[in-house]
């Protein structure tokens, strides 16, 4: 069956999606398994929604039910052979099983039945299979759309609701499945022995981690026997009423060694508790012993002594730490004699004295600027780590936490920075480490630092104390403390250096030129500054005197420092001076602080004159902590763009994915915004032109001896637009994390930036951000009038694009502006949009123009309201769908025999009394608005120069909804009758009727041919749209997979990507217009049939009257006396027949007919009884005569009415036919123009995508 379906030539080209093909393009629709499905959809298509799987899945995947079979069945075969598969993908949206709304997220959950009574759940753009399905699946909804039917077995113009999903509701497996395992990741330098050793090392590491996670407290929790054996004894040992160790709980002065001894006594008691618990004489002693052995077997290399030691220390931490704090904070008056180890060296006063100490004053053997930056960065990180000792959280109030902090601090100081190390090969020797630790301790300002060190040294386990690395760390820290003690000779030097730094920095911030001059003059004659001089000092963040001068924002201070001696500050000192915390250099700091332009230009001049171009590029594009370069901060000083813009990497992204050009466009509060973005774009264009010219020059230097035109142009500086190396801005590199492009974020100045007008710019004006907003939608949403004017002038614009998730169009966003912006600005935006619509989507020569903009749902009335605008009016009252139905009904009633579409046909796809899925609510109204606008366009085309279009539009513009429909119906009926009466006396002869009939027969043939032509055209257009969609989807997938990063992505990526799914094409809308012409022609055809039926009735009446007249003549004249020749000559003329009827019939002209009946009087004579049978026969003859006269009078009345109706209808149809001939030409021309414009826009977009692809290929 499926094979026959695909080889048959009796249907239109096969659709790529086989499920749609088997429903809408099936020559065997009246046979199983399609018959029941098609019949149900034919009669109730508004009550069903078709779930459409990805065409890629249907063609490439197979049915999971046949996975284990030798003959696997492709899913596309199920579309032609399996009725269950087809019915399972059609849901009854007209009658949902249940519908609920979640209380918090307000998501709507709706359960529907399929055509074969299975259940599916729709929730948050996802579909879930339920009752009746063999597999429970969760599938992503990619899009929703309407499918235009083109087949003859569905009603003409019917549209079906589609929900596109990533796979089928039956599931699907890739047809080609790789059976090869993934190759292991190997190191080519490793041998098999090395691999084995690595695995052993990994195993040992895992065991170590496993053992380190074990604590004695966990053992007590996990093994109740052990807890019962030792738990109570440990509780008594640590209890505060334990008088055996009362000395640790009393805050009295004592030596630190005494505290240490007391701790070890308690530790010995703890060990004794463990040993006593495993003695044989103890209850459960043997069981405890076996348990401990079992624990050791579970955790190899477990040190139980260490666990007990840590357990004791943890329980005594508060007691021990409070004792240490008390002893160290005791006055130092006699500590030298009583207990020198308890002397507090690092006091608050000393921290204050050394607060401005700089690394260059500690005799560090490293003096390169980039090396010092790396050291300062390490110091800052180490300070932040060491400061954790000052916190009193539970994570730092343990011995293990203190040790970890010390370890981390040393690691930070001795290892390169994790993020962008400035000197990764830097070697830290012992002297350097001492200097780094001094800076770290001095600036961390940890109170009671000595107490922390004593605690670590005195209360650690024996294996830790004996560790060589740990011992070296602690001895180094002791040396630092000793170096900073009052007994050390170098302390005064450090304090003096810190004081000099403080004086210099204070003088700079206080703008004390006298003090600064004094400091500068003291070494003015020196060729080089000493490395320890305060002018080379830096704070903990790496900021030096020049940075402070920029922040002081005083040109005299800056020049005094920089020009004091040219040899004092080299170009390296200037380039590498930066804040190591934020990684911001001097120029960044100047821009952020908005330093005076004179200072900035002087600094820029210094860099330009002394640094190479590569050094400048590296300097300007250096990124700070937030990923921003100088280019991101150029909006602080716009004049720098023209000076260094050609050296800026405009595609460099910060952590917010903003490029420098993107940042310029987002400076909405800049007073000179247009000049700012113009300067930025011109700098980018200049940079691109230089790249192109360099490329052309390289071609010239490496090419043949003959100098080509391109080489000449490059030599002369001429820009070559058609060169392969030419390119504009790569806008894909300027998209932020929300999907916004430069066109989205720019506030104004589109003409000045040439973002749209520059031919080399590969920009998509209709690109959507991740919220599905196009630039046009954003301009309307945020009231950007200037940008709106610019983008409306671009012929690539998709004006009627909709948000695929909410289905909002541009007029919906226009309606959101009310109350948010100035009324005048909103009116200007509205005027621009309405003018654009009428100039591009409405017949230009139409005198009356009306457009339906958008729809809104009113919860109070539970109805949708359609908003309208006329060309010369502003605010109009919206019409509800109920009112709209009344208007169209009354319009058709007023013009019953025109080409105006019948109301039932117009509302064929919009049964408002039938529910649908929440995803289709707005889409259905948008589709109705589209159809309504086609109605307005057709009326305007059909009645150019006629007032009837204005009459229809006035029904939409006026507020007469209060008038009852029945009253209006009566008025319209009376008006039509009045029009008939105005025709006056109507006389139709047989010849006239025959002429009308001949005219109608000719019109009938012509209309049938025309309708047949438009029917074929509409079919071709509608199926052409499906082929357009198929081709676009395949091309989208191809371009998507051509990307190197996506080429080897799994199949599922293609089916889940919403951006690869197209659901409409330019031929679809064109098909709607062709269908409209066809429907209008069928309306006219129906009217021709109506008058043809009236003419046939007129003929029948005429024949009946003729027969009655003949019978009447036979009663009035004897048979032999009837004239023969004259009688035969007058048979076809009713007037003659009436004249021969004697005195009982006469010709009486009326307003309605040529013939009527006079008063018929039967002789009132008395019948004599003697006459007998003759009187009886005479009475019977008179009765029959009277009946014939009455019957003839009734027929004459009917034919009189038909005379009026035929003449009235003939005039209307003649007029309508003439109008239709003009209308179909105008409307076809208008719709073709719309189609061509839309197709050109679509082709421009595809051309843009291919150009982007070629650009990526060339630059890959």
Curated annotation (Swiss-Prot):
GO terms for molecular function: guanyl-nucleotide exchange factor activity; SNARE binding. GO terms for biological process: early endosome to late endosome transport. PROSITE patterns: VPS9 (PS51205). One of its GO terms (cellular component) is plasma membrane. Residues 336-493 form the VPS9 domain. Belongs to the UPF0507 family. This is UPF0507 protein LELG_01076. It comes from Lodderomyces elongisporus (strain ATCC 11503 / CBS 2605 / JCM 1781 / NBRC 1676 / NRRL YB-4239) (Yeast).
């Amino acid at each position: 069956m499926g094979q026959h379906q695909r080889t048959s030539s009796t249907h239109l080209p096969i659709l790529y999606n086989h499920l749609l093909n088997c429903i809408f393009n099936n020559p065997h629709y009246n046979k199983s398994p399609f018959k029941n499905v098609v019949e149900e959809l034919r009669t109730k298509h508004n009550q069903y929604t078709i779930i459409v799987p990805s065409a890629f899945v249907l063609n490439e995947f197979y049915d999971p039910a046949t996975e284990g079979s030798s003959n696997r069945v492709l899913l596309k075969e199920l579309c032609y052979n399996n009725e269950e598969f087809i019915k399972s993908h059609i849901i009854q949206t007209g009658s949902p099983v249940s519908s609920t709304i979640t209380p918090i997220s307000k998501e709507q959950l709706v359960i529907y039945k399929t055509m074969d009574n299975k259940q599916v759940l729709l929730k948050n753009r996802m579909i879930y299979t339920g009752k009746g399905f063999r597999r429970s699946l969760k599938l992503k909804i990619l899009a929703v759309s309407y499918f235009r039917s083109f087949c003859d077995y569905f009603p003409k113009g019917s549209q079906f609701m589609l929900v596109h999903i990533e796979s089928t509701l039956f599931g699907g497996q890739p047809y080609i499945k790789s059976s090869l395992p993934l190759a292991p990741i190997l190191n080519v330098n490793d041998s098999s022995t090395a691999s084995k050793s690595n695995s052993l090392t990994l195993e040992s590491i895992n065991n170590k981690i496993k053992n380190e996670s074990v604590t004695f407290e966990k053992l007590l929790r996990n093994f109740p026997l052990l807890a019962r054996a030792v738990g109570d004894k440990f509780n008594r040992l640590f209890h505060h009423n334990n008088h055996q160790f009362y000395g640790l709980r009393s805050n009295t002065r004592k030596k630190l060694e005494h505290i240490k001894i007391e701790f070890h006594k308690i530790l010995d008691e703890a060990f004794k508790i463990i040993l006593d618990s495993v003695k044989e004489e103890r209850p459960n002693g043997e069981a405890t012993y076996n348990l401990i052995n079992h624990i050791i077997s579970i955790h190899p290399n477990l040190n139980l002594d260490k666990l007990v030691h840590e357990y004791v220390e943890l329980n005594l931490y508060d007691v021990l730490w409070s004792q240490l704090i008390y002893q160290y904070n005791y006055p130092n008056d006699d500590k030298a004699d009583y207990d020198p180890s308890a002397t507090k060296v690092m006091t608050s006063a000393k921290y204050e004295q050394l607060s401005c100490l700089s690394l260059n004053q500690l005799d560090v053997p490293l003096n390169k600027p980039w090396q010092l930056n790396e050291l300062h960065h390490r110091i800052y990180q180490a300070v932040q780590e060491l400061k954790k000792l000052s916190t009193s959280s539970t994570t730092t109030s343990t011995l293990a936490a203190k040790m970890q902090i010390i370890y981390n601090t040393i690691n930070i100081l001795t290892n390169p920075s994790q993020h962008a190390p400035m000197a990764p090969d830097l070697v830290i020797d012992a002297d350097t480490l001492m200097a780094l630790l001094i800076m770290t301790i001095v600036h961390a300002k940890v109170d009671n630092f000595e107490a922390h060190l004593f605690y670590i040294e005195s209360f650690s386990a024996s294996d830790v104390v004996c560790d060589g690395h740990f011992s070296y760390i602690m001895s180094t820290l002791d040396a630092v403390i000793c170096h900073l003690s009052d007994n050390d000779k170098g302390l005064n030097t450090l304090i003096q250096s810190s004081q000099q730094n403080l004086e210099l920095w204070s003088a700079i911030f206080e703008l004390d030129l006298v003090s600064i001059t004094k400091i500068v003059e003291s070494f003015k004659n020196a060729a080089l500054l000493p490395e320890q001089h305060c002018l080379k000092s830096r704070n903990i963040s790496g900021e030096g005197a020049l940075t402070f001068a920029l922040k002081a924002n005083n040109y005299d201070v800056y020049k005094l420092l920089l020009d004091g001696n040219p040899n004092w500050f080299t170009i390296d000192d200037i380039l590498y001076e930066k804040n190591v915390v934020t990684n911001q250099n001097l120029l960044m700091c100047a821009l952020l602080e908005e330093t005076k332009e004179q200072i900035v230009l002087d600094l820029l001049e210094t860099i330009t004159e002394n640094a190479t171009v590569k050094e400048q590029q590296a300097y300007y594009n250096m990124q700070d902590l937030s990923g921003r370069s100088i280019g991101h901060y150029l909006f602080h000083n716009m004049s720098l763009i023209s000076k260094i813009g050609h050296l800026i990497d405009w595609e460099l992204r910060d952590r917010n994915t903003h490029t420098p050009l993107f940042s310029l466009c987002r400076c909405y509060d800049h007073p000179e915004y247009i000049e700012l973005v113009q300067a930025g774009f011109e700098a980018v264009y200049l940079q691109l032109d230089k790249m192109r010219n360099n490329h052309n020059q390289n071609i010239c230097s490496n090419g043949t001896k003959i100098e080509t035109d391109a080489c000449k142009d490059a030599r002369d500086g001429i820009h070559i637009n058609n060169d392969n190396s030419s390119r504009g801005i790569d806008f894909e590199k300027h998209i932020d994390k929300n999907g916004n492009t430069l066109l989205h974020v720019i506030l104004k100045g589109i003409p000045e930036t040439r973002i749209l007008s520059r031919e080399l710019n590969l920009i998509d004006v209709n690109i959507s951000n991740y919220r599905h907003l196009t630039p046009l939608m954003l301009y309307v949403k945020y009231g950007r009038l200037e940008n709106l004017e610019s983008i409306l002038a671009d012929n690539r614009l998709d004006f009627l694009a909709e948000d695929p998730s909410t289905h909002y169009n541009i007029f919906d966003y226009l309606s959101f502006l009310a109350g948010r912006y100035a009324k005048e600005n909103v009116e200007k935006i509205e005027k621009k949009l309405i003018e654009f619509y009428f100039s591009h989507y409405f017949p230009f020569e139409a005198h009356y123009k009306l457009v339906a903009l958008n729809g809104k749902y009113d919860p109070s009335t539970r109805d949708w309201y359609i908003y309208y605008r006329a060309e010369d009016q502003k605010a109009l009252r919206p019409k509800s769908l109920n009112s709209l139905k009344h208007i169209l009904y009354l319009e058709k009633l007023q013009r019953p025999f025109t080409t105006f579409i019948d109301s039932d046909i117009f509302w064929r796809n919009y049964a408002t009394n039938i529910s649908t899925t929440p995803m289709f609510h707005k889409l259905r109204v948008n589709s109705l608005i589209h159809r309504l606008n086609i109605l307005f366009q057709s009326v305007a085309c059909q009645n150019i120069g006629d007032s009837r279009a204005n009459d229809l539009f006035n029904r939409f513009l006026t507020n007469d909804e209060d008038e009852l429909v029945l009253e209006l119906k009566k008025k319209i009926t009376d008006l039509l009758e009045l029009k008939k009466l105005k025709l006056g006396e109507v006389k139709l002869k047989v010849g006239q009727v025959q002429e009308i009939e001949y005219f109608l027969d000719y019109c009938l043939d012509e209309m049938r041919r025309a309708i047949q032509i438009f029917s074929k055209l509409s079919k071709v257009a509608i199926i052409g749209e499906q082929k357009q969609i198929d081709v676009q989807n395949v091309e989208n997938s191809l371009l998507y997979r051509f990307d190197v990063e996506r080429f080897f992505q799994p199949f599922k990526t293609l089916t889940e990507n919403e951006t690869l799914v197209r659901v409409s094409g330019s031929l679809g809308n064109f098909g709607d217009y062709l269908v409209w012409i066809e429907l209008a022609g069928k309306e006219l055809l129906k009217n021709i049939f109506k008058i043809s039926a009236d003419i046939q009735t007129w003929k029948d009446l005429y024949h009946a009257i003729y027969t009655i007249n003949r019978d009447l003549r036979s009663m009035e004249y004897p048979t032999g006396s009837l004239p023969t020749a004259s009688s035969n000559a007058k048979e076809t003329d009713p007037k003659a027949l009436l004249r021969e009827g004697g005195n009982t019939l006469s010709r009486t002209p009326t307003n309605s007919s040529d013939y009527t009946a006079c008063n018929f009087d039967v002789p009132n004579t008395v019948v004599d009884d003697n006459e007998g049978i003759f009187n009886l026969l005479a009475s019977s003859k008179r009765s029959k005569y009277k009946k014939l006269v009455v019957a003839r009078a009734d027929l004459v009345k009917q034919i009189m009415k038909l005379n009026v109706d035929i003449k009235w209808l003939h005039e209307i149809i003649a007029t309508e036919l003439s109008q239709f001939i003009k209308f179909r030409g105008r409307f076809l021309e208008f719709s073709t123009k719309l189609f061509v414009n839309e197709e050109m826009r679509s082709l421009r977009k595809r051309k843009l995508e291919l150009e982007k692809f070629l650009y990526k290929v060339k630059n890959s």
